[in-house]
Amino acid sequence: MPAFDTPAMMLILWAVIGYGLGSIPFGLILTRAMGMGDLRQIGSGNIGTTNVLRTGNKGAAALTLLLDGGKGAVAVLLARAFAGEDAAQVAALAAFVGHCYPIWLGFKGGKGVATFLGLWLALAWPVGVACCLSWLAGAAVTRISSMGALVAAASSTFWLVLLDQGAGFVLGIVLTLMVFWRHRANIARLKARTEPKIGQKSA
């Protein structure tokens, strides 16, 4: 019988917990609870904050942002408290994967931006704050939500080095690549100059 208190088993345990937390589809739950229908049939069909905003309910969008970010932060903080820093990083990655590929929705989830920001706020708050500001700046200057997300992700490894948080550098690269992968359709539209601006209907 395997020992469940070994380092490897603890990392697996926190990966499962992180995935479970990350896979909670708050955007879908909130829009259904508020009588707005199935979010997957609205706008882009994405379950994240930007698509919730397309319903016209800014409160629901703000709450989705906080909850999707919060689940990433909670996964990190719980893992760190009970199992240390390695487990926190594993839980962070698992929470991000859970949001993007939730088993409950046939592995069709969001793009992970809010969860990305939340987990960095918990892992290394100076990096998290810098990424949030980068996200806001990118979105404010371009008026394109996906551009803010890409700027935040691309800048994260820079902030990790600049703010002396190098322990998370490998995780930062992996998460950045995953954010870009999840936004590959947006990147194609950005190149074609057809990506909708904030407030516009999704193409």
Swiss-Prot record:
Enzyme class: transferase
A GO cellular component annotation in the UniProt record: plasma membrane
NCBIfam families: glycerol-3-phosphate 1-O-acyltransferase PlsY
Organism: Ruegeria pomeroyi (strain ATCC 700808 / DSM 15171 / DSS-3)
Protein's name in the database: Glycerol-3-phosphate acyltransferase
Subunit structure: Probably interacts with PlsX.
Subcellular location: Cell inner membrane
Listed Pfam families: G3P_acyltransf
Transmembrane segments: 10-30, 59-79, 87-107, 116-136, 160-180
Organism taxonomic ancestry: Bacteria, Pseudomonadati, Pseudomonadota, Alphaproteobacteria, Rhodobacterales
Principal cellular location given in the protein's record: membrane
Keywords, sorted A to Z: Cell inner membrane, Cell membrane, Lipid biosynthesis, Lipid metabolism, Membrane, Phospholipid biosynthesis, Phospholipid metabolism, Transferase, Transmembrane, Transmembrane helix
